[in-house]
């Protein structure tokens, strides 16, 4: 029996509630399958670790994760610690340290979800947003001088490399090629950003020649937001820069019903390092400890984790269980207009997994 080693990093806020919920459903899948199992190791990094040690994770933290098969992450963010410290000290340290250059965010309207768009059928909103996850606007290049003085100045430099753009474009075209519609939209802002984004466009055109069966178009990022709202059915796979995709994917999740249901995978496609899977929602300290957090985003992230490990049948089972649960309004959490608790949703998903395991093959 294959045993997968999973690093679990709850992080901050409701991450401490949804990651254990994710472990529960993964364990339930393993129990019903008997062909694989999980060995979980929990890491208490985040805001509490920072208060005790002055850093969000240990200096050699990446070494502790390096031999894992995957990472399940909760959230980073603490109201008492500056956001750039919590993000750069933990999540981005892992993403960049393990060169998880492809951030993949699927979005669709799940059964039972009352999405806010009028005249939008569930089949009209079925997207995957590919986010360049290693450079661009979040490269960390820049600085501040003369702090606190009238002449203070600061820069954040968006840095793009040919190698970085080529690999994310190739990844996005390949992903689009694997989907039924074989359709890719390259999001840009080359009308105003006349250097790096022009290179981005040129490389997209270059890479498109390797995928003649993929139909692709180009859209300015501001126009892309309007298109997502007004013509969602014209989109399928999108690729965008670090900042642009960060914003667009949150909009996508809201259009599908809630940030609480949205997953993401930070992927190293070459599999040199473990990839990391997480819900896209934040730490939500206002509801922490109240049992109100929606664990569906974490469960869907676990689907992506299973797919990455090659456990396709288990991933399909978990996705079916999720859809059966979201189809029942009585099992909707507060963000979806219901009153169900985190544990009630978790138990319901576990029950569906067990029920499917009892069905004759």
Regions found by a protein language model. Name each.
Residues 5-14, 72-77, 184-190, 300-307:
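Short glycine-rich or small-residue beta-strand-to-loop segments that form or flank ligand, phosphate
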